[in-house]
Amino acid sequence: MGLPKSAYKKLLIDCPTRVINKNCAQRVKDVSPLITNFEKWSDKRKKLYFKDEEEMVGQFHLENFNLKNNLYGRLLASPMRAEKISKLKSCRELLIPLKVVPSTGKDQHADKDKLKLVPTLDYSKSYKSSYVLNSASIVQDNLAAATSWFPISVLQTSTPKSLEVDSSTFITEYNANLHAFIKARLSVIPNVGPSSINRVLLICDKRKTPPIEIQVVSHGKGLPITQSVFNLGYLHEPTLEAIVSKDAVTNGIYLDADNDKDLIKHLYSTLLFHSVN
């Protein structure tokens, strides 16, 4: 038995407006996951970019920490890289870069079928690379598994027998390269003296002083400034000690943190490499 026409009319035409969703006609906007979930799938944190940061700082009276001219701020601002021992990410300037090169035999000829992983001082895009913690003690404790430090792309396309890491010279080679670079630069670089406001003082103190220290000293008209002190006596390297101690007037060598960035970075890496964990 069908419904009467009055019932159809009541259901289809005379439907109360209170049950109708007035917003049902509005189409939901399509939002790309590139925008909504970027930080999740890309493993990158959200960042804010401003057209004119200096103007914004002055307009809203914000405190400017001037990290661009800060030695440690520059180190921490380097790109994040995953290192092979702890499997965690860290700032690139706080790690040891490793490069993949063809292995050479006793006849000093390169063997195309074998690859060798060696430490280097600076990152370069010209070769495949990976990273490990910049610590002599940690590297020494994990040298037995050094073949796992190769880049993933190399591990996936090579056999274990074709990969080589010389564990007997790995630490000494990296240490020698660091010291050679520092000696060469310190031999020709000028001592700026305490005139530079943004400065690093190199000293040689074999007593139980920290390898790196931040001091507050007076400058100019008695205004307090901070300076970093790198104690190269911590390295027990006679050649470096002789270079640093040659100027008896200033009791060390002053470096300009703005003009000697590369040297200061490698000095920091050397002290970090030898620090006790």
Swiss-Prot record:
GO cellular component terms, semicolon-separated: matrix side of mitochondrial inner membrane; mitochondrion
Null mutant phenotype: Decrease in plasma membrane electron transport.
Compartments where found: Mitochondrion
Pfam families, alphabetized: RRG8
Keywords: Mitochondrion
GO biological process entries: mitochondrial genome maintenance; mitochondrial tRNA 5'-end processing
Any further remark recorded for this protein: Present with 2140 molecules/cell in log phase SD medium.
Protein task: Required for respiratory activity and maintenance and expression of the mitochondrial genome.
Recorded family membership: Belongs to the RRG8 family.
Name of this protein: Required for respiratory growth protein 8, mitochondrial
